[in-house]
A protein has these predicted regions:
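Short, surface-exposed connector motifs at secondary-structure boundaries
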Residues: 53, 254-257, 278-281
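Flexible beta->alpha loop and helix N-cap segments adjacent to enzyme active/binding sites
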Residues: 3-35, 77, 83-85, 90-208, ...
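Residues embedded in well-ordered beta-strands within globular domains across many folds
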Residues: 57-59, 259, 282, 483
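Glycine-rich phosphate-binding loops at beta-strand->alpha-helix junctions
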Residues: 62-65, 257-273
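Phosphate/ATP-binding catalytic cores across multiple sugar-kinase/actin-like superfamilies
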Residues: 238-258
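Short beta-strand-loop/turn "lid" adjacent to the catalytic site in phosphate-handling enzymes
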Residues: 43-78, 87-90
C-alpha cells in the first residue's frame, strides 16, 4: 500500500509517505539547500517517482475554500492548521495550534477568511482569529540589535502600508510554483521570532505594561501598535515577548495534557512559560509547517488503521559507515581540546533542531565558546547554543530531566557549563537516552575527559542555510574537524 501526505503551503514544503510498511520523508529546503524553501506539486511528484511510489492515495495540507467555517477536511484536502493537529504521533482530546496565518472556509463572498490558530476540544474546532503572535513580535526588528536587517525592515513597512499582501503573494506562489525576488526577505521574516527568543533574555520585563495590554479590548493588536511606533530597547523586546507568553495562557482554558503545534510551538521560552503555568504541552520536532505533510499522511494512516509513526528521519545522504569506538574516542579528544567538530551520522533529523545526527559540537565548559563557535556559525551575538546531555545524568545539570528534542527551556543547575548557559541562566537542552548508542557513547567518552557528560550542540549549517543534507555540504563548513561515519577529516580549511 502506498499512502502520501503533502505539505506545500507557502514555505517549508515537504512530502511524507508510507510505502509497504516503510516511512519516508523529504523536505525541499534540504534537497535544494535553501532555507524554508517552497516547492510545489511538480517537485512532490518528482520525489514520489524517485521513491518508486505509484498510484498512491494522497492527502494534502492546503487552504480550504467554502461556506462552512467549521470545515476541516474536503475529500483528502486538509485545512492547514488541522494538518498541524494531525501531525502528532499521538492523539490528544485537546489540541492547540498557534501559527502565523492560514485561510479557511467562511460564510462570505470570498468563501475564505484568514485565521491564525485552532483550538480543538475533541472534534469541535474553534478558530483563533487574533493578531498572530509572530506579528506581535515583529516590532523587535526596529531594535538596535537588528540594524543589520534593513531589507527586512523595508519588507515590514510594505506590509503595514499594504503595498504587499502576504496572502495574495502566497496564493500566487502556490499557483506558479515559483519563488520570486521577495522570497529571501520573506525567509528572514520567518526567522525573526526565533532570534527575538534569544534577545529577550537580556531585558527586564515591565509587568505593568504587560498587564495593561492584557486588559485592553484587543490585547495583541494593542501590544503591537504601541511598540511598532517606537525604537524598542531590549527591555521593551523582553516585555513584548513576556506579553506573548501570557496572552497564550489567557486565550485558552487550563489544559493539563494537550497536543501543541504550529510555528509558535517551536518557541522554547513560550513552551517553558506554559509548563510553569501548569499546562502540559506535548510538542514534537515537526510541529511546524515542515510537518504538515506528516499530518496529512497521519490522516490517511488513521483511515487505513495503520499506526502513526514517531521515528521520522530525512531522506538524505547517509555515510557508508558508523563511527567505531576508536573514532568516537578521537572525536571526544578533539572536543575536550576545544576544537569545533562537525558530526554527520545516519539520516538527518526531521525538524529545525539538530539532535546528534547533523551537529556542530564543542566543549560546554569553555567560557569563550560563543565567540569560537560563531566564527563558523556567524550568528548574532545574543543567540544561545543548546546542549546534548546523557539522559540518566541530566537531572544534575537541568531542572527538566527528560527533553529529547530541544523544545523547551530548562533552568541550568550547574555553574560549570558556561558555553550552553544563556544570560538568563537557561538552556535549550537535549537529553540522550542510552539506546541512542552512538551519540550516548560519544557523551560517555567526553565525560571521561572533561568530567561532564555533555557537549554544546548546534546545527550543522552556516547562517542563512538549512541543516546539511549531503556530505559535500558538510565538508564545506570551515570546522577544525568533522566526523562523517567512521572517518575524521581535520584541518580541511586551514
Amino acid at each position: 500500500m502506498h499512502l502520501v501526505g503533502l505539505g506545500l503551503t507557502m514555505h517549508d514544503s515537504s512530502v511524507a509517505a508510507y510505502k509497504d510498511g516503510k516511512f519516508l520523508y523529504r523536505k525541499a529546503e534540504r534537497q535544494f539547500s535553501k532555507k524554508h524553501f517552497y516547492a510545489g506539486l511538480s517537485w512532490a511528484e518528482s520525489v514520489l517517482k524517485e521513491w518508486d511510489i505509484n498510484n498512491p492515495v494522497i492527502a494534502k495540507s492546503t487552504w480550504l475554500k467554502g461556506r462552512d467555517p467549521d470545515q476541516l477536511v474536503d475529500g483528502f484536502d486538509l485545512d492547514h492548521h488541522y494538518a498541524h493537529v494531525m501531525s502528532s504521533p499521538k492523539k490528544y482530546h485537546v489540541n492547540y495550534v498557534v501559527d502565523a496565518l492560514s485561510t479557511g472556509p467562511a460564510d462570505n463572498e470570498n468563501e475564505q477568511e484568514v485565521y491564525t490558530g485552532l483550538l480543538m476540544m475533541g472534534e469541535t474546532p474553534r478558530r483563533i482569529k487574533d493578531f498572530p503572535i509572530p506579528s506581535v513580535l515583529r516590532p523587535a526588528v526596529w531594535a538596535q540589535q537588528f540594524d543589520h536587517e534593513e531589507e527586512l525592515r523595508k519588507f515590514f513597512i510594505s506590509i503595514q502600508n499594504q503595498t504587499i499582501s502576504i496572502t495574495d503573494w502566497a496564493k500566487k506562489l502556490i499557483e506558479t510554483e515559483q519563488v520570486d525576488e521577495m522570497w529571501p526577505v520573506f525567509v528572514k521574516s520567518i526567522d525573526l521570532p526565533g532570534k527575538t527568543m534569544g534577545l529577550q533574555s537580556y531585558g527586564r520585563v515591565d509587568n505593568k505594561t504587560v498587564d495593561r495590554w492584557l486588559n485592553s479590548p484587543f490585547p495583541r493588536y494593542t501590544a503591537f501598535c504601541e511598540t511598532n511606533v517606537t525604537r524598542p530597547d531590549v527591555h521593551m523586546v523582553a516585555t513584548l515577548h513576556s506579553f506573548c507568553e501570557r496572552v497564550l495562557q489567557k486565550d485558552v482554558p487550563p489544559m493539563h495534557d494537550f497536543g501543541y503545534s504550529g510555528g509558535v510551538a517551536q518557541n522554547v521560552v513560550i513552551n517553558r512559560s506554559l509548563l510553569d503555568a501548569g499546562y502540559k504541552p506535548n510538542v514534537y520536532p515537526w510541529a511546524y509547517d515542515g510537518g504538515c505533510s506528516i499530518g496529512a499522511l497521519n490522516y490517511l494512516l488513521d483511515k487505513y488503521n495503520i499506526e502513526r509513526y514517531s521515528d521520522w528521519v530525512q531522506d538524505d545522504q547517509t555515510p557508508d559507515t558508523e563511527p567505531s569506538t576508536r573514532t568516537i574516542k578521537k572525536v571526544a579528544e578533539l572536543i575536550a581540546n576545544n576544537k569545533v567538530v562537525g558530526w554527520y551520522q545516519g539520516n538527518g533529523e526531521v525538524g529545525p533542531r539538530a539532535l546528534g545526527n547533523r551537529s556542530i559540537l564543542f566543549n560546554p565548559t569553555n567560557k569563550h565558546a560563543k565567540q569560537i563557535v560563531n566564527r563558523v556559525k556567524q550568528r548574532e551575538w545574543w543567540r544561545p547554543f543548546g546542549a546534548s546531555v546523557k539522559e540518566d545524568q541530566a537531572h544534575r545539570f537541568f531542572d527538566i530531566p527528560v527533553s529529547r528534542h530541544m523544545l523547551i527551556n530548562s533552568n541550568v543547575l550547574y555553574s560549570g557549563i558556561p558555553a550552553v548557559t544563556h544570560v538568563d541562566g537557561t538552556c535549550r537542552h537535549q537529553t540522550v537516552p542510552e539506546e541512542n548508542s552512538i551519540y550516548y557513547n560519544l557523551l560517555d567518552e567526553v565525560e571521561k575527559l572533561i568530567d561532564v557528560p555533555m557537549v554544546l550542540n548546534t546545527s550543522l549549517n552556516l547562517r542563512g542555510k538549512p541543516i546539511c543534507s549531503t556530505i559535500t555540504e558538510a565538508k564545506q563548513i570551515p570546522l577544525d574537524a568533522i566526523c562523517i561515519g567512521d572517518e575524521i577529516y581535520e584541518n580541511m580549511h586551514s
